């Protein structure tokens, strides 16, 4: 297990109309070995990273034969030395836009002259024990005894764009993770138009594509279809991972079932707009890619600035889909979920929402708690309606102070009475939202996500707060902290009940407006991280209109996620089954 690096001088044949002629290539090979998995790629002497193999563990001193270095007279090549680097057929490790690879690229960057050609070449590499954290992002973690990491640094000499490809192989699991770090080492600004986190080129198309699709109350239903020529994929453009598509795909052999066959699983550790696709080419090769959705995306990199792309988890199994699922489960339990509740039994809780909706007061909640305690239920969660003047869903989001008309005696009195019954107490927040009818909106209408001069689209009688703005996050955190410090609260249900529209920010300059999609997600992560750091004993459960944000990014902050608003026993079987294909 671990990372192996070797160098070779090889001779290949150039195919042409006049017969085959030999050509020489210097090759640097990288082999990443997990328990039963090998991942192999190489650097040829013009600096391109060429993928070789991903699958069942292999041995051998010289694996250069795995690299697909083919000449094809109908497609562009990058030099006049006939070295076989034909762009549209090579299996690239991290393909770029503009130099003749017409398949789906991972990277497209516009320079200060408006040109979008990007040409990354190998510059250096380093290997070290352990796994680095990703600044501002959720990611799997490992100490020096649990994993080994390879960083490949590539450079576009024309623009000064540096890309660091980060690979981590885990010692005890068939898992390899990938992420990308960009840096503008030049003098002129660059605009990142597309930055995916992962590409794997397969040398055949003999797979089925598995996705997790659905809708509200029907999340993550398994869909399986045979690959065909062209592009098949899923995405989200809603500002969250969504009810409709989950940031997970798998490529499995046609005969794969729970116990037999090959399965390649890919999961994006991210909670915003994503893009995942499998593309079958004219040669019946397959390219799988995954990362941040490039739709309506742009990120300005001034000189010296960096951008960190989220992580993709790659899992291989030659023992069917079931082994792939169990590997994801083991990884996330051991190396993603954190905090006191990582391995701790979660309390059995009762939530008042379906029983009362907005029509409750202190006495009614205590009555529910008394009956629940007789049944052995361990926690009462007070849901929507306890704050501002919230008697319906058309007011008070953002006003996170106690509605004393309902909670006569105050929050601490209610919590103390519930605690006397031997029960814990939890509370509902929707921290990302703001109601037009709220003290906060009347004071700070500019804090809503908006396009100046355009009417805002209403959804569930609410707008979305601009979490790219630190002032907004600080205010919301201060309000939540005051509530949490006022009583013995041991659980938070964090809800999100609408998606993003009119995506603009009053706090960002014109040339950074398209960054809002991603900056919003980073802001959510920032606030969740502050909560879990300052209140480590509180169990944070994520919810989004049911299961619209059930993803690995959320698992990093909330060890418990509401799976769906559909709790019908039969319907829930499909939802639980689909969810369990990737998530524990």
Q: What are the residue ranges of the model-derived segments?
A:
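Glycan-recognition surfaces
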Residues: 435-474, 518-584
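Active-site-adjacent "subsite" loops/lids of carbohydrate-active enzymes
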Residues: 345-347, 354-358, 401-404, 424, ...
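Acidic/aromatic-lined carbohydrate-recognition and catalytic surfaces
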Residues: 388-441, 529-533, 537
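An active-site-proximal structural segment forming one wall of the substrate-binding cleft
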Residues: 371, 375-377, 465-495, 523, ...
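Conserved, mostly hydrophobic/aromatic
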Residues: 36, 180, 304, 350, ...
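Catalytic domains of carbohydrate-active enzymes, especially glycoside hydrolases
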Residues: 364-387
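Hydrophobic faces of well-ordered beta-strands that scaffold small-molecule active sites
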Residues: 346-352, 378, 382, 425-429, ...
């Amino acid at each position: 297990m671990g990372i192996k690096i070797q160098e070779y001088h090889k001779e290949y044949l150039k195919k042409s109309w006049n017969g085959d002629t030999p050509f020489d290539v210097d090759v640097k090979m990288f082999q990443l070995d997990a328990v039963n998995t090998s991942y192999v790629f190489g650097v040829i002497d013009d600096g391109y990273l060429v993928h070789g193999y991903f699958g069942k563990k292999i041995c051998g001193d010289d694996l250069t034969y795995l690299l697909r270095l083919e000449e094809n007279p109908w497609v562009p090549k990058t030099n006049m030395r006939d070295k076989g680097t034909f762009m549209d057929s090579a299996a690239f490790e991290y393909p770029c836009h503009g130099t003749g690879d017409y398949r789906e690229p991972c990277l497209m960057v516009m320079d200060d002259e408006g040109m979008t050609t990007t040409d990354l070449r190998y510059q250096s590499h380093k290997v070290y024990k352990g796994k680095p954290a990703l600044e501002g992002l959720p990611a799997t973690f490992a100490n020096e005894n649990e994993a080994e990491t390879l960083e490949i640094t590539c450079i576009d000499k024309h623009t000064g764009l540096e890309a660091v490809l980060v690979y981590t192989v885990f010692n005890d699991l068939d898992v390899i993770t990938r992420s990308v770090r960009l840096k503008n080492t030049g003098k002129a600004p660059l605009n990142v138009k597309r930055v995916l986190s992962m590409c794997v080129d397969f040398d055949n198309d003999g797979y089925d594509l598995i996705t997790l699709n659905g809708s509200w109350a029907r999340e993550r239903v398994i869909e399986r279809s045979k690959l065909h020529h062209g592009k098949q994929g899923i995405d989200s453009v809603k500002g969250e991972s969504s009810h409709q598509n989950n940031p997970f795909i798998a490529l499995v052999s046609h005969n794969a079932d729970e116990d037999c066959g090959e399965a390649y699983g890919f999961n994006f550790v991210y909670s915003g707009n994503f893009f995942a696709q499998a593309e079958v080419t004219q040669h019946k090769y397959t390219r799988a890619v995954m990362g941040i959705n490039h739709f309506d995306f742009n990120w300005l990199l001034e000189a010296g600035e960096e951008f960190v792309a989220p992580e993709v988890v790659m899992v291989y199994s030659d023992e069917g889909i079931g082994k792939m699922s169990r590997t994801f489960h083991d990884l996330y339990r051991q190396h993603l979920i954190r905090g006191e509740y990582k391995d701790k039994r979660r309390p059995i809780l009762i939530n008042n929402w379906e029983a009362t909706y907005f029509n409750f007061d202190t006495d009614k909640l205590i009555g529910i708690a008394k009956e629940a305690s007789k049944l052995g239920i361990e926690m009462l969660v007070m849901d929507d309606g306890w704050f501002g003047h919230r008697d319906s869903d058309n007011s008070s989001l953002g006003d996170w102070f106690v509605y004393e008309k309902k909670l006569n005696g105050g929050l601490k009195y209610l919590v103390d009475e519930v605690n006397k019954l031997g029960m814990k107490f939890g509370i509902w927040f929707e921290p990302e939202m703001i109601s037009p009818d709220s003290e906060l909106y009347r004071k700070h209408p500019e804090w809503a996500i908006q396009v100046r001069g355009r009417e805002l689209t209403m959804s569930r009688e609410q707008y979305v707060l601009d979490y790219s703005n630190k002032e907004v996050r600080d205010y919301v955190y201060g309000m939540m902290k005051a509530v949490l410090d006022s009583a013995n609260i041991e659980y938070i249900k964090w809800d999100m009940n609408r998606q993003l529209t009119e995506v603009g920010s009053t706090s960002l300059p014109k040339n950074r407006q398209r960054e809002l999609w991603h900056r919003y997600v980073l802001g959510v992560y920032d606030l969740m991280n502050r909560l879990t750091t300052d209140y480590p004993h509180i169990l944070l459960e994520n919810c989004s209109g049911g299961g619209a944000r059930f993803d690995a990014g959320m698992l990093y902050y909330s060890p418990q996620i509401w799976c769906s608003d559909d709790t019908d026993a039969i319907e829930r079987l499909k939802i639980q089954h689909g969810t369990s294909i990737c998530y524990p």
